Amino acid sequence: MPRSLKKGPFVDEHLLSKVDAQNDKGTKQVIKTWSRRSTILPDFIGHTFAVHDGRKHVPVFIDDSMVGHKLGEFAPTKTFKGHVKDDKKGRR
């Protein structure tokens, strides 16, 4: 079930303050964050976030198609190695 519209999107305060500070200065440095649960706002467009995936920080460049999604959606936590080959034919 989606979040109520009267509450608005959730964004961690420290993340929003870092983006506002960079927008005021006019800089576009990488912002390191562990907040995968924060919603991407239109103010974030053009910034690069280093989102933690549990092991390392994955750089995520924000564009307009990402607005409304969560930061964690763009930093996968699991790597798929592929399925093991079935050797039933070779056992005969």
UniProtKB/Swiss-Prot annotation:
It comes from the Bacteria. GO terms for biological process: ribosomal small subunit assembly; translation. One of its GO terms (molecular function) is structural constituent of ribosome. Keywords: Ribonucleoprotein, Ribosomal protein, RNA-binding, rRNA-binding. The keyword Amino-acid biosynthesis does not apply. One of its GO terms (cellular component) is cytoplasm. Pfam families: Ribosomal_S19. The keyword Zinc does not apply. Protein S19 forms a complex with S13 that binds strongly to the 16S ribosomal RNA. Belongs to the universal ribosomal protein uS19 family. HAMAP family: Ribosomal_uS19. PANTHER family: RIBOSOMAL PROTEIN S19P FAMILY MEMBER, SMALL RIBOSOMAL SUBUNIT PROTEIN US19M. This is Small ribosomal subunit protein uS19. The lineage of its organism: Bacteria, Bacillati, Actinomycetota, Actinomycetes, Mycobacteriales.
